[in-house]
From Swiss-Prot:
First-level EC class: transferase
Gene Ontology terms: biological process: Mo-molybdopterin cofactor biosynthetic process; molybdopterin cofactor metabolic process
Pfam families in the record: Aminotran_5, MOSC, MOSC_N
Gene: mal
Entry keywords, A to Z: Molybdenum cofactor biosynthesis, Phosphoprotein, Pyridoxal phosphate, Transferase
Xref: InterPro entries: Aminotrans_V_dom (IPR000192), MoCF_Sase_C (IPR005302), MoCo_sulfurase (IPR028886), MOCOS_middle (IPR005303), PyrdxlP-dep_Trfase (IPR015424), PyrdxlP-dep_Trfase_major (IPR015421), PyrdxlP-dep_Trfase_small (IPR015422), Pyrv_Knase-like_insert_dom_sf (IPR011037)
This protein's name: Molybdenum cofactor sulfurase
GO molecular function: lyase activity; molybdenum cofactor sulfurtransferase activity; molybdenum ion binding; pyridoxal phosphate binding
Length: 779
């Protein structure tokens, strides 16, 4: 059993708690986003502003002295000095990365390399760098360069190399909290890369496949790392270090820094200049001269001098609240909390033994050198299905717990840990329309992001326990999704505005309608792009209103002719079009037009006699040629038909009920190699929903879709028709055998439902419709 060992004394903890008493009943667990500022810190900053006259450093030398004092404190914080590193103030860590991208001199033939698991700001550098090639490195590619790694050594970078290459990676991943071994820095600088990585772009038709003749420079994104881990620049000497001070102190925002080594300074070529970055410039010629002092050359315009001066209070507060090697102690504290949290999450299990949590990390939580104070995960149901991170965010918010969800601006780590291939990424961002920062959390049941908790020096063990209890209460005690949805909906007004919209989307919704105008042929689909479809007393308008019969007048089905699934009906305007391969035919939708020009015929559907109109020789000839069958005809139902045993439920040419409903979550549980859409098509349902929980639909007795109430008539008993791939006509037995295995020998999949009559049916029948996106309420 992993226990948390307190890092702070009782007196220290009491002092820290007093500084953050404003949290009250709230629990703050997003220190990777920003840590919190202490009360005395901002009071001291305000007192200094009241006491001192701090004006533009171009005007007042005293302000410049304050700023220089802050530079000294920053260098001291990272255990270095002004002889080895320059401090350039920027707006934030992103601006520091941009500064490097803008000004790094690749000397023609150098390459830009970046780690896959990086903040999007590093991806943005690709748009600016003037490199010969751009390469993506995985975490493992970078770790091949660890000093004690037994591998074939890369040739040392030539002393006479003319090109300069830049390697950028995070000291700590802001998604998972994994810490990169910093010993790779010196190895890369001296010997280049063992692996160049995957070429993303190249100016050459044949990009380099091995280490090139180049000087190698390292840019370290330390924004997440420096907030709670000591970065010793005497021991590890990256050429560029990007930091964000609000992540360390909580206040002020709007100021970051770029630490540049003497070596790194030699390859930054300043082009733009502004404000106090020059000794002189002539307006009538191009002549100008940059400042001699390095940081003065790169700090364009007036610095945010008030914010910079307030950093002094941040350093002082940290040293006062966590005395004696502050950042080292903070590192031990947050790692201990993360280790405890991760262990407790592993213990959370459903009654059937299934784990509640899937964790995302590379190396576990035993080694502080490899893992920071961050835990990323997703919640799962007792059947192994994922709970959307948006729902978890809502539950946390209602328990007054602040945490982070999504991809955390680290889409590369998201792609790696969630195992999203490029095709899935396209489906998420291009087809489904997800954007960074939204609450689009599941696509076909698979997560598009995660939940993250991260800890700071003011985080207490009680905060972690409260978070863990929230998960237990929400997902182990309240196991049914409908109960959770009701809990969230009842308190939705208490949620932040960004989450209120997500709360409205928790209930399952109607995803798709499928109309089968011609019995046993392909579906005509209605989804969110096409909107709504009318209802009649028999079901969806035009559903199974036509059928193909053989020369004996018997209904033709896919059991006898699998090619029927390749006939694609389309309803276009006032016409029904039938398409097969490259050919097509059409006929009017109007029943009166068809009846006036057609002969009456009789056939049977499921042993019931039906009456219809023959649709004529033209379509019959087309069907015969398409299917390769003689004597086939197309009939259209002409009279109402009732379900067996009832005079109330009117049917089209369906086998048993007005509607067949299938849950995509249930289909996903079958886990076939074909696409989910292909498997859904096998079941030939009219109404497709996605509850997130497999086979939940089998427990329904009634449901309301939009404003329309339905009753459940029972489960659909399946036959070998579902073995036919509806896109190819090929047969395979896996679908039926899998269902039989999962349902203990029962061939049930999907449910039959019928619309309950209402007082307005006769008056408003033409206005009754189902709309994709309608909320589904189960009773």
């Amino acid at each position: 059993m992993v226990e948390y060992t307190a890092e702070f004394t009782a007196e220290e903890q009491a002092l820290i708690d007093k500084e953050f008493a404003r949290l009250g009943e709230s629990t703050y667990l997003d220190h990777a986003g920003t840590t919190l500022y202490a009360e005395s810190q901002v009071l001291s900053a305000a007192q200094q502003l009241q006491r001192d006259v701090i004006c533009n450093p171009h005007t007042c030398r005293a302000t410049g002295d304050y700023v220089d004092q802050v530079r000294y404190r920053i260098l001291e914080f990272f255990n270095t000095n002004a002889d080895d590193y320059h401090v350039v103030f920027t707006a934030n860590a992103t601006a520091a990365l941009r500064l490097v991208a803008d000004h790094f001199d690749f000397a023609g033939d150098g390459n830009f390399h970046y780690c896959q698991e990086n903040h999007t700001s590093v991806l943005g550098m690709r748009q600016l760098v003037k490199a010969k090639g751009i390469y993506m490195l995985t975490k493992d590619d970078i770790e091949l360069n660890v000093l004690d790694q037994p591998s074939t050594p890369a040739p040392a970078a030539a002393a006479t190399a003319q090109a300069n290459s830049l390697v950028t990676f995070s000291a700590q991943c802001n998604f998972s909290g994994y810490k990169m071994p910093l010993t790779v820095i010196e190895q890369i600088q001296k010997r280049g890369l063992q692996q160049l990585g995957k070429c993303i772009w190249s100016a050459e038709s044949q990009p380099a496949a091995k280490n090139v003749d180049s000087n190698y420079y390292v840019c370290l994104d330390a924004a997440a790392f420096a907030a709670s881990s000591p970065l010793d620049l005497q021991r590890f000497r990256p050429d560029f270090v990007c930091v964000s001070f609000y992540k360390i102190f909580g206040y002020p925002t709007g100021v970051g820094g770029l630490l540049v080594s003497r070596r790194g300074a030699e390859v930054l070529r300043k082009r733009f200049y502004g404000g106090g970055t020059i000794n002189y410039a002539y307006p009538h010629t191009m002549e100008h001269q940059l400042r001699n002092v390095f940081h003065e050359r790169f700090e364009d315009g007036t610095l945010p001098f008030l914010s910079i001066v307030e950093l002094l209070q941040g350093f002082r507060t940290l040293e006062r609240l966590v005395p004696g090697r502050s950042i080292e102690r903070i590192s031990r504290h947050v790692h201990g909390l993360a280790r405890y949290c991760e262990h407790q999450l592993k213990q959370l299990k459903h009654p059937n033994g299934a784990p509640l949590i899937t964790l995302y990390n590379h190396a576990g939580y035993e080694d502080r050198a490899k893992q920071g104070g961050t835990v990323a995960f997703n919640v799962r149901t007792n059947t192994g299905d994922y709970v959307g991170f948006g729902e978890v965010a809502c539950m946390a918010a209602l328990h007054r717990i602040l945490l982070r969800t999504g991809c955390f601006c680290n889409v590369g780590a998201c792609q790696h840990f969630l195992q999203l291939n490029d095709e899935t990424m396209d489906a998420i961002y291009k087809r489904a329309g997800r954007i960074c920062g939204d609450y689009f959390d599941l696509l076909d049941g698979q997560p598009t992001g995660a939940v993250r908790v991260s800890f700071g020096y003011m985080t207490r063990i009680q905060d972690v326990d409260r978070f863990l209890q929230m998960l237990r209460n929400s997902y182990l005690v309240i196991a049914k999704p409908q109960q959770r949805f009701s809990f969230i909906e009842q308190q939705a007004e208490l949620l932040p505005k960004a989450l209120q919209q997500r709360a409205q989307r928790l209930r399952p919704r109607l995803l798709q309608l499928a109309i089968y105008p011609v019995k046993s042929c392909a579906a005509f689909k209605i989804d969110s792009s096409t909107g709504s479809w009318p209802l009649t007393k028999q079901g969806l308008q035009y559903d199974r209103e036509w059928m193909i019969v053989d020369m004996n007048g018997m209904a033709l089905t896919q059991k006898r002719c699998t090619d029927l699934c390749l006939i694609q009906p389309r309803i276009v305007g006032d016409q029904l079009e039938l398409h097969y391969a490259e050919t097509s035919c059409s006929m009017p939708l109007s029943l009166s037009v068809q009846a006036a020009n057609s002969a009456r015929c009789h056939s049977k559907v499921c042993r019931q006699a039906i009456e219809g109109y023959d649709c004529g020789d033209e379509v019959a000839t087309w069907l015969s040629q398409s299917l390769g069958l003689e004597g086939v005809r197309l009939l259209r139902q002409s009279a109402q038909r009732s379900a067996p045993g009832t005079q109330q439920q009117q049917l089209s040419l369906v086998n048993q009920a007005q509607f067949l409903l299938v849950n995509r979550a249930s289909v996903r549980s079958l886990q076939f190699e074909e696409s989910l859409d292909e498997t859904v098509d096998r079941f030939r349902a009219n109404i497709i929903i996605d509850t997130g929980t497999p086979f939940e639909e089998l427990t329904y007795t009634q449901l309301r879709i939009g404003d329309i109430l339905f009753q459940v008539d029972g489960p659909c008993q399946r036959c070998d028709m579902i073995c036919i791939n509806q896109r190819t006509g090929e047969r395979s037995p896996e679908t039926l055998t899998t269902i039989a295995r999962m349902q203990s020998g029962k061939m049930r999949f999907g449910i039959y439902i019928s619309r309950l009559p209402s007082e307005t049916d006769d008056r408003l029948e033409q206005q009754q419709q189902l709309t994709c996106g309608d909320v589904i309420v189960v009773s």
